[in-house]
UniProtKB/Swiss-Prot annotation:
The chain crosses the membrane at residues 4-24, 31-51, 67-87. This is NADH-quinone oxidoreductase subunit K. Keywords: Cell membrane, Membrane, NAD, Quinone, Translocase, Transmembrane, Transmembrane helix, Transport. NDH-1 is composed of 14 different subunits. Subunits NuoA, H, J, K, L, M, N constitute the membrane sector of the complex. It holds the Pfam family Oxidored_q2. GO terms for molecular function: NADH:ubiquinone reductase (non-electrogenic) activity; quinone binding. It is a multi-pass membrane protein. It is found in: Cell membrane. The keyword Cytoplasm does not apply. The keyword Isomerase does not apply. GO terms for cellular component: NADH dehydrogenase complex; plasma membrane.
Amino acid sequence: MSSVPASAYLTLAIILFCIGLFGALTKRNTVIVLVCIELMLNAANLNLVAFSKLGLFPNLTGQIFSLFTMAVAAAEAALGLAILIALYRNRTTVQVDEMDTLKG
């Protein structure tokens, strides 16, 4: 039974991270930027799982850390969406360009 080489996992993780980075740097909608940041975190999780599975001494450390990272990412997404809802109520927009002042 053939296994998938490590280079395939790493290539996929690099592609996911680059797509997320491109979206986070170029998009103006804050919700899309938040989704792109989550995509970058998932690329890092893919690296953790790939290195823990395909390393010299395979163990579950990377997979457990990846689950912990997913829980932190879910909390980050919930907090980010709550902040976005509060900003939308105050300014009626979620565009990044229009949120450049600290005072309302």
